[in-house]
């Protein structure tokens, strides 16, 4: 459960992230594909090379969804309901991949905003990413 402090921390860090959505999203995806090669199986039609327009485009969508969830932090489930349906019923993405991408996204934020990612903000962002992952996998059951 996200506390009031967590919600403020998440909104604050996303204030710094939002203008870099495409770059940070692409960087997180590239990290995930390299670190966890099995995640590439969901993107057989993508050019997964560094700087690929497809990876950048999908990265922008990923971070846009995270920004939307942060903007509606009291209703993450409602905000991401359609995305949850898509990933559970059509794309059938293995639920563990949301956690892997979340970890990669945390690394990207740490690289680009080291002073902003205090231990408290890190913990809040991790809780938020776990909450998003839980919402995206809720319809698998």
Swiss-Prot record:
| Recorded GO CC terms | blood microparticle; haptoglobin-hemoglobin complex; hemoglobin complex
At which positions is heme b bound? Answer: 87
One Pfam family from the UniProt entry? Globin
UniProt entry tagged with the keyword Transport = yes
Q: Please indicate if the UniProt record lists Metal-binding as a keyword.
A: yes
Q: Alphabetically, which GO biological process terms does the record hold?
A: hydrogen peroxide catabolic process
Positions with a binding annotation for O2: 58
Tissue pattern of expression reads: Red blood cells.
Q: Which PROSITE patterns match?
A: GLOBIN
Query: Record's SUPFAM superfamilies?
Result: Globin-like
Residue ranges of domain Globin in the record: 1-141
Matching entries from Gene3D superfamilies are given as:
Globins
Give this protein's Gene Ontology molecular function annotations.
haptoglobin binding; heme binding; iron ion binding; organic acid binding; oxygen binding; oxygen carrier activity; peroxidase activity
Task: Family membership, please give it.
Answer: Belongs to the globin family.
Role played: Involved in oxygen transport from the lung to the various peripheral tissues.
**PANTHER family according to UniProt:** HEMOGLOBIN FAMILY MEMBER, HEMOGLOBIN SUBUNIT ALPHA
Q: What is this protein called?
A: Hemoglobin subunit alpha-A
């Amino acid at each position: 459960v996200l506390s009031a402090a967590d919600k403020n921390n998440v909104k604050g860090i996303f204030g710094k992230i939002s203008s870099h959505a495409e770059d940070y999203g692409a960087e997180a995806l590239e990290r995930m594909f390299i670190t966890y090669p099995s995640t590439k199986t969901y993107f057989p039609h993508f050019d997964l090379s560094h700087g690929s327009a497809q990876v950048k485009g999908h990265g922008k969508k990923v971070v846009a969804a995270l920004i939307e969830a942060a903007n509606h932090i009291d209703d993450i489930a409602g905000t991401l309901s359609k995305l949850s349906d898509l990933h559970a019923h059509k794309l059938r993405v293995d639920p563990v991949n949301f956690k892997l991408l979340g970890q990669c996204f945390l690394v990207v934020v740490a690289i680009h905003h080291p002073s902003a990612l205090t231990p408290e903000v890190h913990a809040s962002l991790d809780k938020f990413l776990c909450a998003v992952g839980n919402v995206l996998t809720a319809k698998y059951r």
